[in-house]
């Protein structure tokens, strides 16, 4: 196709691609992935029969789902756990556990309603400290929009996912705060609701905040839930009560092993 070549040359001012070099590169990629190409549905079907455990991973949150998200600020295919069965080609009833990953605060990339959003120095500080090296887009490096934990949106997201467990991440980031606001409701047209509204009402929503005391210390390296500072545990338990789903995992650092498991 000549069009991509013309775009490459005249729009991006890049050298023309040599077809032989491109073919060689693609052949190398083919050889890399060839051992992993198979009938995925059959492969997983046999694994289930053998009693093996299967982990399916999704990306993006419930609010990006084209059917149940904040349309039109959504993606092109379903982001809900139920769609995992369709994508993998396995029966829905084989999915026994659904782990929903929630940050201990909120962040977002791009436009769309963001009720608990914060601005200015408050947002800059959380953005700088957040994530693994700051809250910036992985591909573009774009600064993410920042906000406090939103119980209303998270409760809705967990419900749509069919959550059995919540993994509560980047909790260590909040250790610098004296007080931590949490969005526990939305005020819309003078009335307060704790249920996630339809999109046109969401645009009018103002956050109802409850402030919890911070723990003002570094919690990295802690291995058991009981060792966490009291105010840290209270924060987790307050969120759990508000969203109505069990927080069974808490991450307190960027490492693979920086996870505290809670008993139900």
Language-model-derived ranges and their functions:
Residues 4-264:
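Non-transmembrane, aqueous-exposed alpha-helical and coiled segments at domain scale
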